[in-house]
Each structure stands twice: as C-alpha cells, then as structure tokens.
C-alpha cells in the first residue's frame, strides 16, 4: 500500500482519491522534509484544481489554509501555515495523519493518536490560541530563569562590592538587595560551620580507614528546572568538568538512566540537552527535592523526594 517506509509525505494508493500520510515526531515535525507533498500526488491533481495554497480540514469542522512552495526537488507546505495547524491541534507526539484530497486542493485530515485511537474532536486542552499560549508560557519561564540566574550569580559572587549585582540585574530593588545580603551572610556562616564539620568527618574517616564521602548536592525544583538544571557553583568548581561533557544520570529506584549534556557557561553551568526529557519522565514537579551524587567523573545518581 505504501511505496516505502519513510515517516513523511508518502503516496497512498488503492483508493479513489489521492492521499498521503505523515507520522509527526517532536524532533522533526516542522522540517522541510516533513512538510513535503509527494510528487506523485501533485501530478495526480489536474492543473485546473492545483494552486499555491491548500486547505487542511479536520473531522470536527475546523480548517487551516497553508501556502505551498517548491524547491528544485519537491513541493512543500510553508512552515507558517503548517506550524499553525500542528500547534492548534497539539501535535508532535508520534500521531499518524492521513491527508485525502477531495477537490480544489482541499484535504480531509484524519488524525490517529500514538495508541491508534482516532481523534474525532479537539483535545480538551487545545484552543485556537494554544500555539500562542505555549509560546507565552515558554517566554514566561525564560524570564523567570533569567531572573533566577541574575540573583544566583550575584549571591554566589565573593566580591564585597554590590555594584556587580546592580550591573548584572539592573532591576533588583533595594529591599531585594538587603535580603540577598542577609542571605549571603547567613550562607557564609553556615558554610564555615559546614566546612568545619566536613573536615572533622573526613578526618574521622581517614582514621577509621574508610573512603572519602561521595560528592553530592541537593536542589529544590523550581519552574526553570523543568527546562534545564543549573548546578551550584561551589559543586561545579570542586567536582565538575571545565568543558561541555555528556553525563549519564541514573535513577536506581526505577532502574532508568538518561544521557544529559552538561554545558559550561560563564553565568551558570547546567544540565541542558536531554534534561527536560529526564524531568518529564521522572514526573518532577516544582517543590520536589532532588539529591545528586557524583558516582563517577561523568555519571550521577539522582534521588527524588516529594515534599
């Protein structure tokens, strides 16, 4: 029935009207190849009905107009209209779509979920502005992230002059600065006490002939941590690589592991590529407490406590 096993734009024969299918994957649903329209389908439509636009219509009555362009090799749907269609329907999770040409470049689109269930009505979470809402939500998260980075960068600095913090954030109020100074003073005092206890512990371990403690750090999950995870500066300085490195993070309780890219930056080194997937599959929520233990130079073990 299908000429080859690719995931995009293949012609479907053995039916009255020309049709093709696509499987939408998150990583490539907006690429030019994914937006390709099979050459055989274009040829099967008469010149009178073809145009530089097509209409995508779903079973519950909504439709989207998408412009068509052509490169030296094939015709394809332009990204603006295609992405609007994908975003409005919340697609990109391995859905199977069939496109059947009815007339005048109007295509009936049938959508099947990854489990094979046909979508006969819009998802409850989807509205006409879902694409815009997602972009606004992501923009809001990044604003929160930037603010957190500015505050953390200032509070972690050992320079006594607060002008550095002012030039970094530019928006911190006097009250926030006073609070940060107080927190920094408390942090310094706790750090001295912690270092003293650590020296005593390591000393006792040495006397007892045991190995040194496994390096670890603990973080309470914030909103930004669902996208990427900033590593505490002191832990970075003492234990982490000085260049971008691939880490493997293990979750012994679920017997799972993930490959995550550790990115080194001037502001804050962090787990980036692969981290959001880990956070999603672990079901991390704001307020959860995660403990990370460095078991090998590029491997960590994570423990999650639900608060």
From Swiss-Prot:
Highest taxon, organism lineage: Eukaryota
* GO BP terms in the entry: double fertilization forming a zygote and endosperm; embryo sac development; synergid death
Q: Where in the cell is it found?
A: Nucleus
Any one of the GO CC terms? nucleus
Q: Which residues bind DNA?
A: 20-115, 214-307
Return the Polar residues bias intervals. Answer: 166-177
Which Pfam families does this UniProt record tie to the protein? B3
Give me the ranges of the annotated region Disordered: 122-141, 151-209
* Keywords in alphabetical order: DNA-binding, Nucleus, Repeat, Transcription, Transcription regulation
**Where along the chain is composition biased (Basic and acidic residues)?**
178-192
MF annotations from Gene Ontology: DNA binding; protein heterodimerization activity
| Alphabetized InterPro entries for the sequence | B3_DNA-bd (IPR003340), DNA-bd_pseudobarrel_sf (IPR015300), REM16-like (IPR044837)
Stated name of the protein: B3 domain-containing protein At5g18000
Q: Which organism is this protein's natural source?
A: Arabidopsis thaliana
